[in-house]
Design a protein with these regions (language model features):
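Extended, subdomain-level signal for the structured scaffold at the beginning of enzyme domains
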Residues: 1-94, 98, 107-118, 126-186
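Catalytic nucleophile serine of serine hydrolases
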Residues: 102
Length: 186
């Protein structure tokens, strides 16, 4: 299975790295997609670097099984590009998994997809989503049809597990893996 990861400058370091690594560990192919191919990206904390493997104008939603949208400043930069918004819309229309964390739902909002949907996001993004007609809940992981959303880095283990469970066709709540830090989970 192939996963598209939309990434721009200033991504939240762990919100890219944790789900990206978990997906690779599970045997998924993850393509980092940006505005341009070969662009060197740096997380806003400066701890992580990533290189875009493909340009947005060279990919189609049909090429992938799921979409990952990390947070940080990346979604704010990406939402200014109509090609990115069109890709997000096409992905949602396909009914395939869309997973967004923290500021990631800004791309869903920019694509005018949040009205009537239930989701979560970083606290400062939640009001914007509500104003656009979304039902926002403050929970670690929220599933609504083909969407999985999460709030913040503390939620990443549950977020990553929910993505993998969805890709594997499981609707059950994920059990913590051996060695997972579950202190952030109630």
């Amino acid at each position: 299975m192939k996963i598209a990861c939309l990434l721009g400058q200033g991504f939240e370091d762990s919100e890219f790295r944790v789900p990206y690594d978990r997906l690779l560990e599970e045997g998924y192919q993850v393509d980092v997609i940006g505005v341009k191919a070969g662009e060197e990206l740096t997380g806003y904390k400066g701890k992580e670097k990533a290189k875009t493997e493909k340009a947005i104008d060279g990919v189609r939603a049909d090429d992938y099984d799921a979409l990952l949208i990390p947070g940080g400043q990346s979604p704010d930069h990406l939402r200014a590009d109509k090609r990115v918004i069109d890709f997000v819309r096409a992905f949602d229309a396909s009914g395939k998994l869309v997973a967004a964390v923290c500021h990631g739902p800004q791309l869903l909002a920019a694509a005018h997809l949040v009205k009537g949907r239930t989701l979560t996001a970083w606290s400062t993004v939640q009001d914007d989503l509500k104003q656009m007609g979304a039902n926002v809940v403050d929970e670690e992981v929220v599933r609504d049809r083909n969407w999985i959303t999460s709030r913040k880095p503390d939620d990443l283990l549950a977020f990553s597990s929910a993505i993998i469970d969805s890709l594997e066709g499981s609707d059950e709540a994920p059990a913590p893996r051996k060695g997972d830090n579950t202190a952030a989970h109630p």
